Amino acid sequence: MAELPPSEVKGVWFVSALDYARELHGDAQVDEWIQRAHLGYRDIYQSPIPSAWYPEASFQEALSMIYELVAQENAFLFEQIIEGCTEKGVNRLFKMLLRVSSAAFVLRRVPTMWRQIRRGAGHVEVLQQGGHSIVSYTEFPWFKDPLYRMLTTASLRAVVRTCTQRAPRVEVMDFTHDSLSVHIAYRCEPEFSPLHHVSTRPPPRNSL
């Protein structure tokens, strides 16, 4: 079995998820769930530091706990929970950006958002025209886990809804063990909308 590449998640995600869970379920219930977590991750879940970086394994474990304990293995409820966590998280990091943004504008910032909350594995590209965006994730070998695919679609839906107050149509186009392509359709305000392409990858050097 191939070794997974290094990947870390910023603590602000755990803080947002913890705050959201405590608001909905109360301290006692959340503390009970945390006590059922892997011993090595309990301190992360109990008192996450927003600026700290935590291993991908702790994030994957958190997703599993949310799905099994909080959502009771209900995919629709799991996505609703992730949307709530995402809204809290993006409002912490990108509040001013979202307040004045269109769906198209904020989706072009998805690669930047990725680098704000993740480091290590993975690249993100956005291809956009009119009222459609395709967000492609590559070199991130966690997409074989269906929870990561649900996480991604729910997060994109929440980001757009936060800035437009409308839910876009979000659909998985294709995925492999380390890639995922998602199509987002939304209302496009301007009549003319040029083609946009943004990426976490550095631009290619001009050949001589």
Q: What is each stretch, according to the model?
A:
Residues 31, 35, 95, 99, ...:
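A generic signature of intrinsically disordered, low-complexity regions enriched in glycine/proline
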Residues 1-72, 205-208:
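N-terminal leader/assembly segments
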Residues 2-15, 115-150, 163-208:
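Short terminal or interdomain "cap/linker" segment that borders an active site or interface and mediates
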Residues 38-46, 88-89, 176-186:
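Short, mixed-charge aromatic SLiMs
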Residues 48-151:
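Amphipathic interaction/junction segments at domain boundaries or subunit interfaces
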Residues 27-40, 79-80, 108, 167-177:
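Short alpha-helical "patches" and their helix-cap loops
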